[in-house]
Swiss-Prot record:
CDD domains: SIP5-like. PANTHER family: PROTEIN SIP5. Disulfide bonds: none annotated. This is Protein sip5. Residues 1-70, 201-261, 380-415, 465-524, 551-591, 605-735, 750-784, 825-862 are annotated as: Disordered. Coiled coil: none annotated. It comes from the Eukaryota. May negatively regulate the snf1 kinase. Residues 13-24, 551-578, 751-778 have a biased composition (Basic and acidic residues).
Length: 862
């Protein structure tokens, strides 16, 4: 044991000692995993530790699951990779590849997407059937020198004309250009590993010994010479491939092989850029200057650069409406719904099937095909120039033999072998059109399915019962045989179900045989159903409109009936109140106004109310100046009873001409001018019945009853009852012939006469409908005021003989009453202030009753 421990301890101590020695020596520790991990020697414990670490690590990873990339993100990444690859390829191609001084990639004139086939465009440019992408010049001067043209062609800043050109611009061709061209030839041509030896050998034999492709240095092996590695250590697979290829015919060449011609930067002793740009032309579309070797349109022989040519393409697939002649109606209606895409038109003459031809420069530089296709070998452009390597023998300067330069006199067909159309560089236009038609067909089918699902087509339930299984047949049989389905367990009729299955199977078989007919039938049924539904909706809408119109008409009729009933009710109510209505311009209203004025004469109270909206002056006995007792003498006026009521002198009233009182009252109350006679006061001259009212008043004083007229002649709104208004102008109505109050007032006047007092009443023009009014501006100048004094019964002048002949013209019937006339016969005394009586002509119609035609024969004596 002790020996074992000693043997173990030294080993452990040695291990520690070695470890310490390694650390002390400055050398890194052991590199093996077992030396680094002390648990590595213990498999069980170390495995458990690793297992725990794996579980913990896996749990941490599972907590944050990795997000799965979507299809859109993958598409974006793919597009980004392609864009970066295009940029790199563009830079490489500009540095290493060219065709007669032009390039095989676009130069950035247009920034839009390049959706043309780049491989086809590259092939056509190498074959010299389409002009390469020349470097364009924004500006061009005819007097540029050679080194200026070289700088412009290479994209460098244009130096001054007298500036000494740099060596790299106008220097001669470098001696190592052959090595550069040979290295490019090995790098740019198609790899030979993918071709067989026999194919390469046949291709090499097609080249003449004088071809520039064979003018390579001796250090470069021939194209068909195998390398040492392949000759010494050739794999067994290649050996078998060579044996099999010797027996079988060679496979056709998938693509022609590109060859880089010797690099030569000069043509006829001058730089290639100077040779190209010395006669630059401007493209009519992009307005950029290019070498004169541009594409020519096949139709109108106009110049167009390749940058513009590759941008012209067919329009996107669209419906054929409004494009060209109408399509011929075909039996299949679906053909008319197909999308179309017309060929591109010429940008100059707008002729369809746009295509171009190309005349290459007379020299060859850059890339060519080692074995041209038969089409290229026999190709000669429309401008009598060749673009293949089988062209006429080249001169020592590399230029083709000159030929007669002639222009094309006629346009070329779009199918000509020399013409390159826009469809040639975009061969996928037909595939895009088919894809668009397919998408539209799918969309139409989906829309038809949605429409068909929205309606139940007639007759489809019987024809398609087989698709619903056995339960559908059982339901139909139960509906047909209700007696059997009434609770019994009798099985359905097997003959009917089998017949339905046979018919449905036959229908399905016919559908499989003729799907177009079935589809057409379904479309026709759907159209008929949609038409019927449209008609039904139209009829329903029309019925709804008629219902609404009838309802509105009924409402309007009810409304009109209610309105008419309300108007009739109002009219009836007005008729019950007064037989004369509410019109103040009527003859009866004027007669009432006249009666009110006459009544106010006896009562000493005036109420102004005129039909012509003239407001009269109301003068109370307190406002009238009392005359001196004993002035003047009484004069009998018997003519007043005979003159009728032709003038205001025939009325039992007096006038007083107090200028101060009249002017003050006229200033206070200004009347509105009458529309009938704006320069005078309106005295109701159109009312001929006022005189009858005045005569009726006198008749009532001689034995007639005025109570009857007080109830029948009144203002509307009094309801047959008379009421006295206030002197200050209350809106109350009063009777025109209230003789009871008149008798009491006269008795009171008899008492006042004993004390030698007189009441003066103003006889002014008044109206019956207004309490407060104003006189006209000319009333103070045109109206004469008279005063009359009411005397006791011993006065010689009496108002007892008033002509009754005019009473019948008014149509106003006054009832006869018996009253004491001795009380109402006051004495009339004429004062010095009383003016003489004026005839109607002199008065000019200013007094009330001026329209009366009776004559006045009264005379005034003093």
């Amino acid at each position: 044991m002790g020996h074992q421990q000693s043997s173990m301890n030294p080993s452990r101590g040695d291990s520690h000692g070695d470890r310490h020695r390694h650390y002390d020596a400055g050398v890194s520790g052991p590199t093996s995993a077992s030396d680094q991990d002390p648990y590595a020697s213990r498999n069980g414990r170390g495995g458990r530790r690793n297992l725990v670490a794996a579980i913990v690590g896996g749990g941490s990873n599972n907590e944050v699951p990795e997000r799965k990339e979507t299809a859109a993100e993958r598409q974006l990444r793919r597009l980004e990779r392609e864009r970066i690859a295009r940029i790199e390829e563009r830079e490489r191609s500009i540095k290493e590849e060219h065709v007669d001084g032009g390039y095989l990639v676009t130069m950035g004139v247009y920034t839009g997407p390049e959706d043309f086939n780049k491989a086809i465009v590259r092939q056509l440019m190498i074959e010299r059937r389409v002009a390469p992408f020349w470097r364009g010049l924004d500006d061009y001067q005819d007097d540029w020198t050679e080194h200026q043209l070289v700088a412009a062609g290479r994209g460098l800043p244009i130096p001054a004309a007298d500036e000494v050109p740099a060596e790299d611009i106008a220097g001669p061709h470098s001696p190592d250009s052959a090595n550069v061209s040979s290295s490019n030839l090995q790098n740019l041509m198609v790899p030979l590993a993918s071709r067989t030896q026999s194919a390469s050998y046949d291709t090499s034999l097609s080249l003449s010994p004088s071809h520039p492709a064979f003018s390579t240095p001796s250090s470069v092996p021939p194209l068909n010479a195998p390398t040492t590695s392949t000759s010494l250590l050739r794999p067994r697979s290649k050996t078998l491939g060579l044996r099999s290829s010797a027996k079988e015919p060679p496979a056709p060449d998938p693509a022609p092989r590109e060859i880089q011609l010797p690099r030569d930067t000069q043509v006829n002793g001058q730089a290639i850029e100077a040779f190209l740009y010395k006669d630059a032309v401007e493209c009519s579309i992009c307005l950029i200057w290019y070498p004169p070797y541009l594409n020519r349109t096949r139709c109108c022989d106009q110049s167009i650069c390749s940058e513009c040519f590759v941008q012209i393409k067919r329009p996107e697939p669209h419906t054929p409406e409004h494009h060209g002649p109408p399509p011929i109606a075909s039996e299949n209606a679906e053909d008319t719904e197909m999308l179309v895409s017309e060929p591109a038109a010429c940008p100059y003459c707008q002729r369809p099937e746009f295509g171009v031809t190309y005349e290459p420069p007379p020299f060859r530089r850059g890339l060519v095909y080692a074995k041209p296709s038969p089409e290229v070998a026999n190709f000669s452009s429309a401008m009598s120039s060749s673009s293949s390597i089988n062209s006429p023998p080249l001169t020592s300067s590399g230029l083709a033999a000159p030929r007669g330069d002639r222009r094309r006199a006629t346009s070329l067909s779009a199918n000509d072998s020399h013409v390159i159309t826009t469809d040639r560089i975009r061969p996928d236009w037909s595939a895009k059109l088919e894809a668009a038609n397919l998408r539209k067909a799918k969309k139409n089918a989906a829309a038809s399915a949605l429409h068909a699902a929205a309606f139940v087509l007639p007759g489809t339930s019987e024809n398609r019962t087989y698709t619903f299984g056995r339960s559908r047949f059982g339901r139909n049989n139960r509906s047909d045989n209700s007696a059997e389905a009434s609770g019994t367990a009798t099985p359905p009729n097997r003959d009917a179900s089998s017949r339905a299955v046979i018919e449905s199977s036959g229908h399905a078989r016919r559908e499989d045989q003729d799907p177009n007919a079935t589809r057409r039938m379904r479309r026709d049924d759907l159209e008929e159903l949609m038409m019927a539904e449209a008609i039904r909706l139209s009829i329903a809408a029309e019925e709804e409109r008629k219902k609404k119109a009838n309802k509105e008409a009924a409402k309007e009729a009810v409304k009109q009936a209610k309105k008419q009933a309300k108007e009739d009710k109002k009219k009836e109510k007005k008729e019950r109140k007064s037989i004369y209505g509410a019109n103040g311009n009527s003859a009866s209203s004027s007669m009432l106004n006249l009666g009110s004025s006459i009544a106010a004469t006896f009562t000493g109270r005036r109420r102004g109310d005129s039909t012509a909206s003239h407001l009269a002056i109301e003068v109370t006995p307190e406002e009238v100046e009392v005359p001196v007792q004993g002035k003047g003498k009484g004069v009998d006026r018997p003519s007043l009873a005979n003159q009728g009521s032709s003038t205001d002198n025939g009325l039992p009233s007096g006038q007083h001409s107090d200028p101060s009182t009249s002017s003050s009252l006229l200033e206070t109350h200004q009347s509105v001018t009458s529309p009938a006679s704006p320069d005078k006061l309106s005295h109701i001259r159109e009312m001929s019945t006022v005189s009858s009212a005045a005569s009726s008043l006198v008749e009532s004083g001689n034995g007639t009853n005025a109570q009857g007229s007080s109830t029948s002649i009144e203002n509307p709104g009094t309801n047959g009852a008379s009421s006295e208004g206030n002197e200050d102008g209350d809106s109350g109505t009063e009777s025109m012939f209230n003789f009871q109050s008149l008798t009491a007032l006269i008795e009171k006047e008899d008492d006042n006469e004993k004390t030698h007092s007189a009441d003066h009443v103003e006889n002014a023009h008044e109206a019956s409908d207004s309490r407060h009014g104003s006189r006209d501006e000319n009333a103070s100048q045109d109206m004469d005021v008279s005063m009359e004094t009411i005397r006791p019964a011993d006065s010689p002048a009496r108002v007892d003989n008033i002509d009754r002949n005019h009473s019948s013209t008014t149509g106003l019937q006054m009832l006869d009453t018996e009253i004491d006339t001795s009380i109402i016969t006051p004495q009339l005394t004429i004062t010095p202030e009383t003016p003489a009586v004026m005839n109607p002509t002199e008065e000019n119609g200013k007094q009330l009753g001026s329209s009366f035609t009776s004559r006045t024969n009264a005379e005034i004596t003093q």
